[in-house]
């Protein structure tokens, strides 16, 4: 028993894992993407920060009162039965599968900029597969090893970003910031809306503590703390750092950069310092991917334990690592990386990001809707339940706004992926629906 507990994550490791899942993949390219819109994107930040905190608070409540295992799938089951559990885990798993390939591609792109290398599309695809496999194999040591490695690599993002938040003000130009407000003169709501998907991509990961509930010490207490702490910490760092950098680097240079933080430090100090920052960013990106690869294996394992996914995802080693499932996942991702080989890596990256955001929002909406009944079952006093239900409603409304802002193409493909899930559930439904009827 004590040995099993020793391989579980504590609250600090889980909070760091939640933060690194958001920060590592999200913030690296964010200043470049937001510069395409202008500094008016600070309004998008505030909207997304409020929406994300509402989601995080509601997830914390779900974590406190839910008595079902499996993270978001367990929450959804309260309101939508076994089909809701399946759909939450299926769409979340698909989202992570897509997002992890996008993260790996961005790590390769950042690394080539650091080394001054020029890779062909095929070489980029092969390098992406290499990154995916390295980050998968590093997870074979179990939950505690993953937490320890992530807690080291997160500093690759925290040091330069927090450093920029503190010392960047000495190079900050208010005039430059104001001139970059809305460079393309887009209508207000159009400009704010076009930044929403970008900012939410940065926050994806606020639910990762929920996905890892089965490998956490004292989940009732630790999951809510980790979700809220990780989200709040990331929100402050995001908003300050991306707005400081917009007052240091001219808008056009920032929009055309492939390594915005490296560019900022190169302008503040020397090109060599910029290279060091880029190296730290590559390290943090790989650490983020490491955390996500562990999370997706855990999501697939939870679904397999429930009987939704094939049994191969449930098999674990002596250190509780679902190695066979991890290998299956990375093989699928390798195929996806080969399929995405394209002369325009950036456009392919954006398609992957938007599709990942859309599919990730589905389990968010299911979880928000389920909080009402979760609290009723837990006999939460009506006055307290009303507050949490209202916050969950705000989180759901933000989720729908984010879906709308993701664009028609992402919504189309995301819908097809989601509807396919209902068909797949039909194939496994007899083992659940017949049991319910005869039970």
From Swiss-Prot:
Cytoplasmic side: 1-9, 61-90, 135-151, 207-224, 297-320, 375-386, 431-439
Known outcome of mutating residue 425 to F: Moderate decrease in both uptake and excretion activities
Family affiliation: Belongs to the amino acid-polyamine-organocation (APC) superfamily. Basic amino acid/polyamine antiporter (APA) (TC 2.A.3.2) family.
Species whose genome carries this gene: Escherichia coli (strain K12)
Phenotype for residue 77 to A/D/N/Q: Strong decrease in both uptake and excretion activities
Protein name per its UniProtKB record: Putrescine transporter PotE
CC per GO annotation: plasma membrane
Effect ascribed to mutating residue 301 to A: Excretion activity decreases more than uptake activity
Gene: potE
Keywords assigned by UniProt, alphabetized: Amino-acid transport, Antiport, Cell inner membrane, Cell membrane, Membrane, Symport, Transmembrane, Transmembrane helix, Transport
């Amino acid at each position: 028993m004590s040995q099993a507990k020793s391989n579980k994550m504590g609250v600090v490791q889980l909070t760091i894992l939640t933060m690194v899942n958001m920060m590592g993949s999200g913030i690296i390219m964010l200043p470049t993407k937001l510069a395409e819109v202008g500094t008016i994107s600070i309004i998008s930040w505030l909207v997304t920060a409020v929406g994300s905190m509402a989601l995080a608070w509601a997830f914390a409540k779900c974590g406190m009162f839910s008595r079902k295992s499996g993270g978001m799938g367990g929450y959804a089951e309260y309101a939508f039965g076994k089909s809701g559990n399946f759909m939450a885990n299926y769409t979340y798993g698909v989202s992570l599968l897509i997002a992890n390939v996008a993260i790996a591609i961005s790590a390769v792109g950042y690394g080539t900029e650091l080394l001054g290398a020029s890779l062909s599309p095929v070489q980029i695809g092969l390098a992406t597969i290499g990154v995916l496999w390295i980050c998968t194999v590093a997870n074979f040591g179990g939950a505690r090893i993953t937490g320890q490695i992530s807690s080291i690599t997160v500093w690759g993002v925290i040091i330069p970003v927090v450093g920029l938040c503190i010392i960047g003000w000495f190079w900050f130009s208010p005039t430059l910031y104001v001139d970059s407000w809305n460079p393309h003169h887009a209508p207000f709501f159009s400009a704010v809306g076009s930044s929403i998907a970008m900012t939410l991509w940065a926050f994806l990961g606020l639910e990762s503590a929920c996905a890892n509930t089965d490998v956490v010490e004292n989940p009732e207490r630790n999951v809510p703390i980790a979700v809220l702490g990780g989200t709040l910490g990331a929100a402050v760092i995001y908003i300050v750092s991306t707005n400081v950098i917009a007052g240091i680097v001219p808008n056009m240079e920032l929009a055309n950069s492939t390594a915005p933080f490296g560019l900022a430090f190169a302008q503040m100090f020397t090109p060599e310092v910029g290279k060091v920052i880029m190296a730290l960013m590559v390290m943090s990106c790989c650490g983020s991917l490491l955390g996500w690869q562990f999370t997706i294996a855990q999501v697939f394992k939870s679904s397999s334990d429930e009987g939704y996914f094939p049994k191969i995802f449930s098999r674990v080693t002596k250190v509780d690592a679902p190695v066979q499932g991890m290998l299956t996942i990375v093989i699928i991702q390798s195929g996806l990386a080969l399929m995405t080989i394209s002369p325009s890596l950036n456009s392919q990256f954006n398609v992957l990001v938007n599709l990942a955001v859309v599919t990730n929002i589905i389990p968010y909406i299911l979880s928000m809707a389920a909080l009402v009944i979760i609290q009723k079952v837990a006999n939460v006093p009506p006055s307290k339940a009303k507050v949490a239900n209202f916050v969950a409603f705000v989180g759901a409304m933000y989720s729908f706004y984010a879906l709308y802002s993701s664009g028609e193409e992402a919504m189309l493909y995301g819908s097809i992926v989601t509807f396919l899930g209902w068909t797949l559930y039909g194939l496994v439904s007899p083992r659940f629906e017949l049991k319910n009827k005869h039970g």
